[in-house]
């Protein structure tokens, strides 16, 4: 048996302690955990965390991380007392809008397999007698939610891991990360000694950015203070909680006022997000000697600012009348970690091989994410997908100090807000735009934001098309929720794309150039496609993990013998290719490949529609006939005097090309195409139409329809694996999966009434029981019906009847053909 690698974990809070235990369970005990504070109470967020665990999350992965945390803490016991008190979690609504949101959250829970139910005000009052029943419109109850004893759990995990052979060092500062040849070699301590290591994992919480700086890594995390108070004793709670946990009422969340509550014996604890954001400069934190560290004195517990809490105190007394004669006995401003998108930061650092992070992880998800990191280290991938929490998911502009501060503070303000899935952040905005932004604004573009990019959703200039839009292209009226960030203009834009020609801004699609003598070998090894084709070939393929999970889907265009252009999904893909290229060059210096992000230096216009060739004939002398430039081929062409790389691809299912040019010529390219297409009725179209058209065509969206937890065959993407290809990452798993019946499949659904809309993540019922969930949905303007894609049992077949639960209402739907539009690909290949 190979000896386990030497692992150093920085931080002995709830994440670091759980990770040490998860590694030990897997036989990795050559581990050292370093904590700058005393081991009995480290002084970070874990030490003052109130411990409320509400498992339900719009993210499937985050809900599953929370579920494992509950499971593990329940099993972590001493003297017959576990580290989790399963009192249940109750979220209440005091406004009609919140009541609807609770129904949506019940849908999330059902989709992800978490037992929950919606309850009336009387049931809320019965479960939590302190409530003012008249103020409550309804509630959402998850019986398995509850209270984590985080500090106690850390102590038991330390005892358990120590017994297994793990070493813990308290009161020990880390001053540097040692490295050689691009790999981590150890951790330097405050006394200048070095602990040698093959792997270092930073679980330093809000101190994480300081650890990241030691290797030149930007950790996009902002420490913010959050208020928590404890009342004096309530006669109503006297003698109610004699047990070791000191709580029996369900944990309570009053999101309409940004508040949450729990019992502390005969007192009530109150947490508030209703105050101003309070960024914390860690350099100003007081140094607390180990001998003085206590529950009331620690670095992460700051002085209470009563004036910030007073509005929340009034809101609390309105909801809990028993507190109207009570007072605040204790309060503090506690430091927690916030990120630009509210997610955790997990995974390998591309800057240094062997360095990992697991930060911005709250108690709720701690054991689940620790297990995922342990699986990542030991097995190479985690059981639960980490794609939403990958530390490398942010674009460079999203890791600047200014962006991290502004976006993280905005997330604090909006933490309990009712957020529509299409709702863009309010700030920061206008960070990245296509070079033809001015033209888009002239056409009245309505922009949504993604990864810092401003992307047109529809164009107000196309409203005039509604006057001549055929009746059969008009969509039924929507409910108020699905109508948000939607415009009927999208119907006209879809109509023009299918019947004439439209221009789509594809500039935000991330583009890489991979070049060098090892480029082909790199791409052949990492992708499922056969890339060894003649220059001009374009290949759609997948990137898999070793288990066959889909880590991304990409298009690879061979522009020259040793030069390729890739369309990828995110910064995660850039870092994956970059790291693998470095490893390849280290093993064989002659097989080097340079990986560059060319997105910002280029632009892309999708020119699609049955009249696209007529437009090209007016602006280029190059041959765009089917014989000259076939489907999934590329060519270097000149359009209006501008050098352009044209790729015969279409994500909307129509004839056309993705046209790539230098950013400096982008506006000129737009103007040339728009002028040439005028006589053919050309329009600019947005993402609203785009999403509808791509779903009609059955095109999957990575990160939404498919993730690393899915494999190609169940996702309907088996065609992207080159026949007889071997030796690529995931090939062994593919051989097994190809001949193994799948338990689930991605199915196309049509809505039976032809009018009701869903948006995604809703539960799907089969024979009256939850059986899956919606991934994407839209109104299909061409196919004249609302449609959705959903993960369902593989036994479902075309014609089967299901129901989609949308805000508590069951909507009948039918399993339909996939795709619904142009299944023979005649329009694309024409």
List the predicted regions and their residue ranges.
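Beta1/beta-strand and adjacent pyrophosphate-binding region of the FAD-binding site
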Residues: 2-15, 32
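Flavin-dependent oxidoreductases
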Residues: 18, 177-288, 295-303, 311-319, ...
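Glycine-rich FAD pyrophosphate-binding loop
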Residues: 24-45
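Dinucleotide-binding Rossmann-like beta1-alpha1 core, especially the glycine-rich loop
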Residues: 50-127, 256-261, 265-271, 279, ...
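Short beta-strand to alpha-helix junction loop
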Residues: 64-67, 92-101, 140-159, 169, ...
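Helical element adjacent to the flavin cofactor pocket in flavoenzyme catalytic cores
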Residues: 140-199
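C-terminal catalytic lobe of FAD-dependent flavoproteins
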Residues: 256, 281-285, 292-428
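Glycine/proline-enriched, intrinsically flexible loops and inter-domain linkers
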Residues: 389-830
């Amino acid at each position: 048996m190979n000896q386990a690698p030497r692992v150093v974990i920085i931080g002995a809070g709830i994440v670091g302690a759980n990770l040490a235990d998860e590694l030990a369970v897997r036989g990795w005990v050559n581990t050292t955990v370093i904590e700058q504070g005393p081991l009995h109470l480290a002084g970070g967020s874990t030490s003052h965390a109130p411990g409320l665990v509400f498992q339900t999350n719009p993210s499937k992965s985050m809900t599953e991380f929370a579920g494992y945390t509950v499971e593990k803490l329940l099993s972590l016991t001493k003297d017959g007392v576990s580290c989790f008190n399963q009192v249940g979690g109750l979220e209440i609504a005091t406004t009609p809008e919140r009541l609807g949101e609770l129904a949506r959250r019940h849908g999330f829970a059902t989709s992800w397999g978490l037992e929950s139910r919606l309850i009336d005000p009387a049931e809320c009052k019965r479960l939590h007698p302190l409530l003012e029943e008249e103020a409550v419109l309804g509630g959402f109850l998850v019986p398995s939610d509850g209270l984590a004893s985080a500090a106690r759990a850390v102590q038991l995990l330390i005892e358990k891991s120590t017994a297994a052979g793990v070493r813990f060092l308290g009161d020990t500062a880390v001053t540097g990360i040692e490295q050689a040849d691009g790999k981590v070699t150890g951790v330097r301590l405050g006394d200048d000694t070095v602990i040698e290591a093959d792997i270092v994992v930073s679980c330093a919480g809000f101190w994480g950015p300081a650890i990241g700086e030691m290797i030149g890594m930007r950790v996009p995390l902002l420490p913010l203070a959050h208020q928590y108070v404890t009342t004096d004793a309530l006669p109503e709670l006297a003698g109610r909680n004699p047990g070791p946990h000191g709580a029996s009422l369900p944990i309570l969340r009053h999101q309409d006022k940004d508040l949450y509550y729990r019992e502390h014996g005969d007192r009530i604890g109150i947490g508030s997000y209703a105050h101003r954001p309070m960024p914390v400069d860690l350099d100003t934190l007081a140094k607390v000697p180990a001998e003085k560290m206590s529950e009331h004195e620690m670095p992460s517990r700051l002085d209470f600012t009563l004036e910030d809490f007073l509005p929340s105190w009034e809101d609390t007394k309105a909801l809990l009348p028993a507190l109207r004669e009570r007072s605040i006995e204790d309060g503090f401003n506690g430091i927690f970690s916030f990120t630009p998108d509210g997610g955790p930061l997990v995974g390998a650092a591309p800057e240094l091989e062997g360095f990992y992070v697991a930060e911005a992880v709250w108690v709720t998800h701690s054991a689940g994410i620790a297990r995922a990191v342990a699986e990542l280290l030991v097995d190479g991938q985690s059981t639960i997908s980490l794609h939403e929490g990958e530390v490398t998911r942010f674009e460079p502009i999203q890791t600047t100090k200014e962006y991290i501060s502004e976006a993280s503070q905005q997330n604090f303000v909006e933490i309990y807000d009712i957020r529509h899935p299409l709702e863009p952040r309010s700030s920061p905005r206008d960070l990245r735009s296509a070079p033809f932004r001015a033209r888009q604004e002239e056409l009245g573009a309505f922009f949504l934001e993604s990864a810092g990019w401003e992307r047109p959703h529809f164009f107000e200039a196309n409203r005039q098309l509604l006057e001549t839009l055929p009746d059969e292209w008009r969509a039924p009226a929507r409910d108020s929720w699905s109508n948000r960030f939607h415009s009927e203009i999208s119907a006209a834009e879809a109509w023009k794309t299918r019947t004439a020609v439209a221009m789509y801004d594809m500039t935000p699609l991330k583009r890489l150039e991979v070049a060098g003598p090892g480029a082909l070998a790199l791409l052949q090894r990492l992708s499922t496609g056969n890339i060894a084709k003649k220059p001009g070939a374009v290949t759609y393929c997948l990137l898999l993990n070793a288990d066959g999970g889909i880590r991304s889907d990409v298009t690879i265009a061979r522009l020259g013998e040793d030069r390729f252009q890739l369309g990828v999904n995110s910064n995660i893909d850039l870092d994956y290719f970059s790291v693998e290229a470095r490893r390849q060059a280290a093993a064989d210096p002659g097989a080097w490949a340079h990986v560059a992000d060319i997105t910002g230096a280029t632009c892309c216009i999708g020119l699609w529609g049955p009249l696209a060739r007529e437009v090209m004939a007016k602006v280029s002398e190059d041959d765009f006939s089917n014989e000259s430039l076939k489907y999934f081929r590329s060519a270097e062409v000149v359009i209006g005097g501008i050098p352009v790389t044209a790729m015969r691809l279409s994500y909307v299912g129509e004839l056309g090309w993705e046209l790539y040019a230098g950013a400096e010529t982008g506006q000129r390219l737009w103007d040339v195409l728009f002028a040439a297409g005028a006589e053919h009725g050309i329009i600019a179209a947005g993402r609203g139409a785009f999403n509808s058209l791509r779903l009609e065509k059955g095109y999957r969206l990575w990160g939404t329809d498919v993730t690393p937890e899915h494999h190609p065959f169940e996702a309907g993407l088996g065609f992207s694996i080159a026949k007889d290809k071997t030796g690529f990452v995931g090939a062994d798993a593919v051989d097994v999966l190809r001949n193994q019946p799948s338990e689930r499949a991605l199915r196309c659904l049509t809505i039976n009434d032809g009018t009701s809309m869903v948006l995604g993540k809703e539960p799907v019922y089969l024979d009256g029981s939850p059986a899956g969930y919606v991934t994407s949905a839209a109104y299909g303007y061409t196919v004249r019906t609302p449609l959705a894609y959903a993960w369902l049992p593989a036994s479902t077949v075309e014609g089967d009847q299901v129901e989609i639960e949308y805000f508590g209402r069951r909507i009948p739907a039918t399993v339909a053909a996939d795709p619904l539009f142009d299944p023979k690909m005649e329009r694309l290949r024409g």
